């Protein structure tokens, strides 16, 4: 069978780099050919972080950063292809998520905004780009997120196996695969790595808490944890999605102001428990037992995985590598898959997950010609 090569590009809310993957979809399961992470230069990262918070002169900065991010994504593709013997002419399309700078689906006129000009990516790589995956779902009354459950369903579902796929990036989201004719469900549970990363960056100038070691050295404060878990988002019914608009450094500082007596490592431990408890609560509402497979950056945080296991005794806990998909690259592979679905004219959203009025082909195509 002829190879079906697609490239997936993903930069999440944690903004810890652009993940690029080359995937072959000609077989029954996606085959990861090669992968690459392109670091986000510090000046660009600062600009993106500024743009994620309301301020003045946003339109000019948005326009510049849209081009800058497009150039960075193109660089990621070109560097990816230097790692393998696949010519750009053999790649059917690039699926680019872009960089989210606003996700506000619950306004009267909801919207989501990802930047990273696909025209720039297409012209600088010579490969057609499929991008802007989320806004069609929002136009149909949906949340525009999460989009990965459709990929999880096709890749990980098995009759008779009750599974939850947990993606822990900046925000955590779950896909419930019931293993029978019941609906697949999925939604954002709340913060994943975003708050634990923000706190260690603020206090220790380190990009992330490696293996959760700093959190492990602290002790969770139950009063602070209770206050954090009282955020209205956690009691919302699904479909629901969230982002930095709700869970950000400004919100965290506001929550911490009555708790300035706490040691810094105790706050880190509490923030990690916020992630774990909010995930576990939502999982137990769906089912108190099953198979749990974790992907995303959180899969490499040993302390996070240990705490999740303690909160979910009815679940077996693994990463998606046990199902044949590297947890580091799972989301990039999902956006390559979304590009394939667009190319084939197939729907890629799950209305039961996003709340959209119907299934739809997602994304628009930007030609390299």
UniProtKB/Swiss-Prot annotation:
What this chain does, per the entry, is described as: Catalyzes the specific phosphorylation of 1,6-anhydro-N-acetylmuramic acid (anhMurNAc) with the simultaneous cleavage of the 1,6-anhydro ring, generating MurNAc-6-P. Is required for the utilization of anhMurNAc either imported from the medium or derived from its own cell wall murein, and thus plays a role in cell wall recycling.
Q: According to the UniProt record, what class of enzyme is this?
A: transferase
State what protein this is by name: Anhydro-N-acetylmuramic acid kinase
Give a single Pfam family match: AnmK
- Which family is this protein grouped under? Belongs to the anhydro-N-acetylmuramic acid kinase family.
What pathway does this protein act in?
A: Amino-sugar metabolism; 1,6-anhydro-N-acetylmuramate degradation; Cell wall biogenesis; peptidoglycan recycling
* Entry keyword Nucleotide-binding: yes
Query: Which Gene Ontology molecular-function terms are recorded?
Result: ATP binding; kinase activity; phosphotransferase activity, alcohol group as acceptor
Q: What is its EC number?
A: 2.7.1.170
Listed GO biological process terms: 1,6-anhydro-N-acetyl-beta-muramic acid catabolic process; amino sugar metabolic process; peptidoglycan turnover
Which positions are annotated as binding ATP? Answer: 12-19
Q: Which InterPro entries match?
A: Anhydro_N_Ac-Mur_kinase (IPR005338), ATPase_NBD (IPR043129)
Q: Which gene encodes it?
A: anmK
Organism of origin is: Shewanella baltica (strain OS155 / ATCC BAA-1091)
Catalytic activity from the UniProt record: 1,6-anhydro-N-acetyl-beta-muramate + ATP + H2O = N-acetyl-D-muramate 6-phosphate + ADP + H(+)
Q: Which domain of life is it from?
A: Bacteria
């Amino acid at each position: 069978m002829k190879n079906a090569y697609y490239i997936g590009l993903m930069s999440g809310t944690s903004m810890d780099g652009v993940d690029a993957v080359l995937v072959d979809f000609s077989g029954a399961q996606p085959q990861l050919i090669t992968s690459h992470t392109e670091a986000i230069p510090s000046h660009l990262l600062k600009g993106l972080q500024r743009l994620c918070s309301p301020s003045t002169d946003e339109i000019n900065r948005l326009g510049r950063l849209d081009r800058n991010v497009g150039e960075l994504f193109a660089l990621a593709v070109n560097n990816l292809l230097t790692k393998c013997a696949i010519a750009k002419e053999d790649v059917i399309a690039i699926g680019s998520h872009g960089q989210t700078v606003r996700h506000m689906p619950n306004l009267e006129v909801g919207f989501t905004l990802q930047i990273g000009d696909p025209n720039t990516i297409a012209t600088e790589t010579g490969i057609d780009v499929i991008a802007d995956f989320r806004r069609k779902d929002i136009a149909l009354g949906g949340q525009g997120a999460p989009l990965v459950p459709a990929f999880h369903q096709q890749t990980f579902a098995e009759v008779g196996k009750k599974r939850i796929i947990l993606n822990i990036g900046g925000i955590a989201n779950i896909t419930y695969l019931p293993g029978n004719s019941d609906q697949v469900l999925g939604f954002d549970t709340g913060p994943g790595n975003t708050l634990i990363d923000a706190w260690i960056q603020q206090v220790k100038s380190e990009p992330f808490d490696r293996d959760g070691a700093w959190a492990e050295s602290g002790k969770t404060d139950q009063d602070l944890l209770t206050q954090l878990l009282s955020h209205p988002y956690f009691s919302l019914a699904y479909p629901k999605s969230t982002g930095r608009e709700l869970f950000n450094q400004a919100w965290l500082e506001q929550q911490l102001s009555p708790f300035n007596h706490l040691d810094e490592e105790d706050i880190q431990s509490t923030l990690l428990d916020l992630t774990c408890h909010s995930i576990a609560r939502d999982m137990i509402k769906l089912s108190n037992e099953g198979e749990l497979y974790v992907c995303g950056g959180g899969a490499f945080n040993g302390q996070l995985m240990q705490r999740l296991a303690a909160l979910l005794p009815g679940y077996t806990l693994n990463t998606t590598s046990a199902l044949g998909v590297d947890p580091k690259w799972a989301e990039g592979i999902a956006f390559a898959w979304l590009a394939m679905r667009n190319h084939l004219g197939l729907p890629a959203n799950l209305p039961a997950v996003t709340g959209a009025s119907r299934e739809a082909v997602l994304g628009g195509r930007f030609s390299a010609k």
